Amino acid sequence: MTDFRIYFAGRDDIPGEFILGRDEKLDLLLVALPGVSCSIALHITLEGEGAEVNLGGPYLCPGNERLDISVTMEHKVGGCISSQDFKGIVGGTAQVGFYGRIVVAHDAQKTEAYQADHNILLTDTAKVTTRPQLEIYADDVKCSHGATVGKLDEDAQFYMRSRG
């Protein structure tokens, strides 16, 4: 059975640590809405074979918000799967930082881990810092990470606004 949790940044008390045992599954959605400034720090440990984590969520920072998301995903045993997928829209003078780290231990063979952070900037004064990292000590793994930060040009913004 999958444990599904939704947390709203700035409103909910978000636990800083999750530990998953054998065959446990966790779907974790983090949502940051406009007007919320906060730091979120998560440490997720997969210490039982067959454990699976799906983590991600949207953040919308159109004003002067300050948002930091720090995630450490630690694979201690093999046969586990983790996925991180964050997406942000940042405007105004907002500042967002994403610091993600996947650690795969030497004994964690057959690990599958994915990490992504994708952002759209709406203004020249908005700032996004994104640092996805992989720390892999095992040989037989499937791991990837990536990040994008792009700006919508004025024509694209006009088109979207004119369509509602």
Where are these regions (language model features)?
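Conserved beta-strand/loop scaffold segments within soluble protein domains that form the structured core
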Residues: 1-158, 162-163
